[in-house]
């Protein structure tokens, strides 16, 4: 594989993640589903991983159903081949109040599909957000 091809793969993996984050911000879980491989592993690091598209979508549907709005704000994005890292603030709106959550995300993209997604964040902030603190 030549250097040109490597740059193209990196650019496409980055674009997949950018497009995925935009779809997540749209609040439509079905739009997010289109970005996942069938064997995707989604792991919010403070919790147990969801393995496979059905388990991943069950987790996303449940989580997104708790909020009126979700927006992924990407601050920095870096990639190395199929691996894409995002430094984000995820903004969750609940009962008309928006709460920011700093997140570090790691994605693995193969053939234009996300095969792994890990998010690192402070679970205490999520608990406080859900309890209205």
Model-derived regions, located:
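Short, low-complexity N-terminal intrinsically disordered segments enriched in polar/charged residues
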Residues: 1-34, 38, 133
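A solvent-exposed, acidic/Ser-Thr-rich amphipathic alpha-helical stretch
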Residues: 29-33, 37-82
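Short beta-strand segments that buttress and anchor functional surface loops
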Residues: 86-94
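Short, solvent-exposed coil/turn segments at beta-strand boundaries
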Residues: 32, 80-83, 107-114
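Hydrophobic/aromatic beta-strand elements that line small-molecule binding cavities or substrate pockets
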Residues: 60, 72-77, 89-90, 102-107
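Short beta-strand edge/turn micro-motifs at domain boundaries
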Residues: 106-128
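Anionic, Ser/Thr-rich low-complexity intrinsically disordered regions
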Residues: 85, 99-101
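A short, polar/proline- and glycine-enriched secondary-structure boundary/capping micro-motif
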Residues: 96-98, 126-131
């Amino acid at each position: 594989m030549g250097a040109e091809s490597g740059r193209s793969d990196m650019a496409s993996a980055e674009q997949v993640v950018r497009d995925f984050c935009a779809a997540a911000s749209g609040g439509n879980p079905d739009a997010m589903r289109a970005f996942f491989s069938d064997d995707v592993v989604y792991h919010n690091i403070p919790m147990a991983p969801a393995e496979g598209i059905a388990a991943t979508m069950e987790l996303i549907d449940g989580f997104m159903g708790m909020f009126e709005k979700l927006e992924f704000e990407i601050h920095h994005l870096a990639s190395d081949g199929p691996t894409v890292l995002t430094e984000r603030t995820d903004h969750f709106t609940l009962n008309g109040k928006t709460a920011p959550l700093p997140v570090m995300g790691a994605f693995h993209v193969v053939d234009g599909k996300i095969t792994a997604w890990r998010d690192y964040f402070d679970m205490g902030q999520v608990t406080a957000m859900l309890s209205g603190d």
